[in-house]
Amino acid sequence: MPTTNQLVRKERKRQTKKTATPALQGSPQRRGVCTRVSTTTPKKPNSALRKIARVRLTNGHEVTAYVPGEGHNLQEHSVVLVRGGRVKDLPGVRYKVVRGALDALGVEGRKQGRSKYGTKKS
């Protein structure tokens, strides 16, 4: 515990908050262009082929974004909207593609939880 005199001489250091999504630079979402669309395998104990896209954002950052939902229409040069949100079993994936915005179509045949996958009411 510092003395009052020590605090007068040198005040306490403020703790800096570390952001989970630095590439968005405080924005809720950012637009970007897909540079690569591929699949990757998750960490143990899970097993799947998770769809990911490498996206160059408008601010120059290049990020890896997860493409949620079943099936997608993304390919190289597709313009997508990227939001924050990590995928726990994919190391290094801290962003998600917003379905139903720009070139990323909504999930076909989705009945429940449609707003998260950009599906219109059918």
Curated annotation (Swiss-Prot):
One of its GO terms (molecular function) is structural constituent of ribosome. The modification 3-methylthioaspartic acid is found at D89. Residues 18-28 have a biased composition (Polar residues). Keywords: Methylation, Ribonucleoprotein, Ribosomal protein, RNA-binding, rRNA-binding, tRNA-binding. CDD domains: Ribosomal_S12 (cd03368). InterPro entries: NA-bd_OB-fold (IPR012340), Ribosomal_uS12 (IPR006032), Ribosomal_uS12_bac (IPR005679). The keyword rRNA-binding applies. Residues 1-45 are annotated as: Disordered. One of its GO terms (biological process) is translation. GO terms for cellular component: small ribosomal subunit. Belongs to the universal ribosomal protein uS12 family. With S4 and S5 plays an important role in translational accuracy. Part of the 30S ribosomal subunit. Contacts proteins S8 and S17. May interact with IF1 in the 30S initiation complex. NCBIfam families: rpsL_bact. This is Small ribosomal subunit protein uS12.
